[in-house]
């Protein structure tokens, strides 16, 4: 189902996408690198947690981008 969004909604969603891409993505990549440097990945909880959080961020970006791509823009009330 296509979401009905106002221009304000679109701006908020785009701001979240930008923040996730420009800020959170970089921080999460660094967290993965840092955790990876701690050695054995098979028992490295920090590494697996960092990867999971990075993947969650990427999933949210894809979801929001898809929402914007398919949205129906309505007038602000």
Residue ranges of model-derived segments:
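Glycine/charge-rich, flexible interdomain linkers and switch-proximal surface loops
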Residues: 44, 71-77
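N-terminal cationic and glycine-rich segments that engage phosphates or anionic surfaces
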Residues: 1-18, 22-56, 61
């Amino acid at each position: 189902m296509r979401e009905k969004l106002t221009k304000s909604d679109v701006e908020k969603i785009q701001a979240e996408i930008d923040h996730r891409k420009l800020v959170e993505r970089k921080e999460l990549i660094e967290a993965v690198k840092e955790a990876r440097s701690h050695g054995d990945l098979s028992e490295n909880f920090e590494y697996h947690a960092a990867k999971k959080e990075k993947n969650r961020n990427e999933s949210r970006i894809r979801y929001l981008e898809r929402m914007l791509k398919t949205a129906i823009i309505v007038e602000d009330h």
